[in-house]
Amino acid sequence: MLRQIKPRNARSKRALEKRAPKIVENPKTCLFLRGTTCSQITQDAMNDLYAMRQVHAKRFHKKNAIHPFEDATSLCFFSEKNDCSLMVFGSSNKKRPHTLTFVRMFDYKVLDMLEFYLDPDTYRSISQFKTSKIPIGMRPMMVFAGTAFESPVPNAFTMAKSMLIDFFRGEPSDKIDVEGLRFVVVVTADEPTSSTSTNNDGENPAPLPGMTDPRSIDPSQKPILRLRVYGIRTKRSGTRLPRVEVEEHGPRMDFRLGRMREPDPAMLKEAMKKAKTPQEERTKKNISMDLLGDKIGRIHMGKTDLSKLQTRKMKGLKRGRDEDEGGEDDRTDVVEAGSGEKKKKKKVKG
């Protein structure tokens, strides 16, 4: 049940209407936060992601004493204060160095979270690539390669795919301009081995009989997510279709998935609801059109008891008493009147 806030003036009313649920939702705004300890590599990675999300992104520079998996109260406060449904929290410590935590919100409450551990050795920022920069507000194409993303059971990799799609989605549009397809984001997952297989919680499962405990394996042995960004250039090929070339634009990031928080089923069901538009034509059952354009309908009725059917009874259709006795058709009935009255004759036709 969503809470209702009563506006006090016209200005607050307009602000609430702007945040109210809509049939076509506004683009998701992403808020970038940093913890009390955040390495320079993590800050550079957040700056690169912020540059790719500009127009629909906000960034805080001050340190925040926040631990998302322990207490998410501050995240809910910042989400409601800034009207943000996506968050990227950067932190770094001895146990989990160079960590980016992606958070999705619904109704200003945490829906799900996932940790990405950045590899500092292979990371390259956008400034290290001597190529043309991506225009602000441009929507990318996305490619996910790897069997880990195709798992029928929700796990950390399927959640990572869903979060990255939400992160790079941008403004919704009905039409696609070919000239606007300027860059592509490619996310590749290494093939998991038997020793690095994970369960739905993103953690290693319990060992099978006769096998070593996978939980004792070094976290660096888990499958890697490789994120690459390429620019697209079309050149003449002498044929109808142009020749397409790609050039790496940056950033270049390699991640390992860490802790995750799965969404609550009831909250996820509420978040996935889609409102019906008034223009959407509703299909009516048992109604069709024939070749001439006439509307044909089918109705289903139960059995009717014809013995209790009420019909219209006319006075002229009533059967006479003498007709039942086999009398003549034309006869004269003598009606005895009371004492002192004359006898009256009435002609009755049977």
From Swiss-Prot:
Segments of this protein annotated with the region Disordered: 192-219, 301-350
Keywords: Nucleus
Subcellular location per the Swiss-Prot or TrEMBL entry: Nucleus, Nucleolus
Bias (Polar residues) ranges: 192-202
GO biological process: maturation of LSU-rRNA from tricistronic rRNA transcript (SSU-rRNA, 5.8S rRNA, LSU-rRNA); ribosomal large subunit assembly
Nucleus keyword on record: yes
InterPro entries in the record: Brix, Rpf2
Cellular component terms (Gene Ontology): nucleolus
Domain Brix stretches: 28-266
SMART domains in the record: Brix
Main subcellular location of this protein, as a coarse class: nucleus
Keyword Lyase found: no
Gene Ontology molecular function, alphabetical: rRNA binding
Superkingdom assignment: Eukaryota
Subunit annotation: Component of a hexameric 5S RNP precursor complex, composed of 5S RNA, RRS1, RPF2, RPL5, RPL11 and SYO1; this complex acts as a precursor for ribosome assembly.
Family to which the UniProt record says this protein belongs: Belongs to the RPF2 family.
Function per UniProt: Involved in ribosomal large subunit assembly.
Protein name: Ribosome production factor 2 homolog
